[in-house]
Amino acid sequence: MGRFRGSITKLSRREGINLAETEKVQKYLDKRPYAPGQHGQRRGRGRPSDYSVRLREKQKLARLYGMGEKQFRNLFEEAASVPGVTGTVFLQLLERRLDNVVFRMGFASTRRQARQFVGHGHILVNGKKVDIPSYRVKIGDEISVFEGSRQMGFVQENMEAQKRRRVSPWVELDVENFKGTFSRLPAREDLALPINENFIIEYYSR
């Protein structure tokens, strides 16, 4: 499974969840709550196999975070090798990706936009430029927008929109100064993800 580069709305309809986590995509899903294509509304009549259910769950989570199979599996194997609840540790590792933290802080409206924003060198971690989307953020790290990038139109729009939204409880945000702090690891109950991570554990344990 490579990284999907097509329409995030179509992919969200196929997977049955809002992969962009935006109001625009959610409205579209509410209007058309079935898979794309001429047979989309007829999907789901047959009972899917246990394997297909687990595969679909794995694909949903990987696509939610915009990751390819190799990178996704390597991260899962790391989570499985350390103490703790594997599913929760895995989700925490996903949440610590720099592109995801940039998205959670509202500097970008989607993870895809956040990945591009980081890759183009617009983000600083503790005052130093980091252009690797998969960079792992640590508790206490300060994430900020490069000063020369703060006047970009979409950054201004995102920050204005963020003022009206609830900030994820594991990050602290200073909207006026275009910076935030990754203050703690999210607990499983913090993450309103429509995912059953136990299916993913079972998929990789088969």
Swiss-Prot record:
Q: Which domain of life is it from?
A: Bacteria
User: Which SUPFAM superfamilies is this protein grouped with?
Assistant: Alpha-L RNA-binding motif
Annotated GO biological processes are: ribosomal small subunit biogenesis; translation
Region Disordered, residue ranges:
29-52
Record GO terms (molecular function): rRNA binding; structural constituent of ribosome
- What is one term from the GO cellular component aspect held by the record? small ribosomal subunit
For this UniProt record, give its keywords in alphabetical order, as a comma-separated list: Ribonucleoprotein, Ribosomal protein, RNA-binding, rRNA-binding
Domain S4 RNA-binding: start-end pairs: 96-171
Key word RNA-binding present: yes
So where does this one cross the membrane? none
Assembly mode: Part of the 30S ribosomal subunit. Contacts protein S5. The interaction surface between S4 and S5 is involved in control of translational fidelity.
- Give a short account of what the protein does: One of the primary rRNA binding proteins, it binds directly to 16S rRNA where it nucleates assembly of the body of the 30S subunit. With S5 and S12 plays an important role in translational accuracy.
Q: Which HAMAP family match?
A: Ribosomal_uS4_B (MF_01306_B)
The family assignment reads: Belongs to the universal ribosomal protein uS4 family.
Q: What is this protein called?
A: Small ribosomal subunit protein uS4
Give the source species: Deinococcus deserti (strain DSM 17065 / CIP 109153 / LMG 22923 / VCD115)
- The encoding gene: rpsD
